[in-house]
Amino acid sequence: MRKYQENGMLESVVCNGCGKKLVVERGILREGGFAVNYPWDYFSEKDGEIHHWDLCEDCYDSLIHQFVIAPEIEEAVEFM
């Protein structure tokens, strides 16, 4: 879950899985985190809802280990 200051700068990020507060310095997330901002569509029971949540890297790893089919992972060729 993310909180922003009135000026739009990122203030804090808390893992929705375990409650860990992730490191944010000067509006920049300084550790591994996974953000979801998903707008549910017409064919869903959640149509019209947008879900926002964050996971720390450990909770992300725990989540994907539950998958029957692993996610596709590729190497990034450029880092921003």
What do the predicted segments below correspond to?
Residues M1-M80:
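Acidic/histidine-enriched, beta-strand-rich ligand/metal-binding domains
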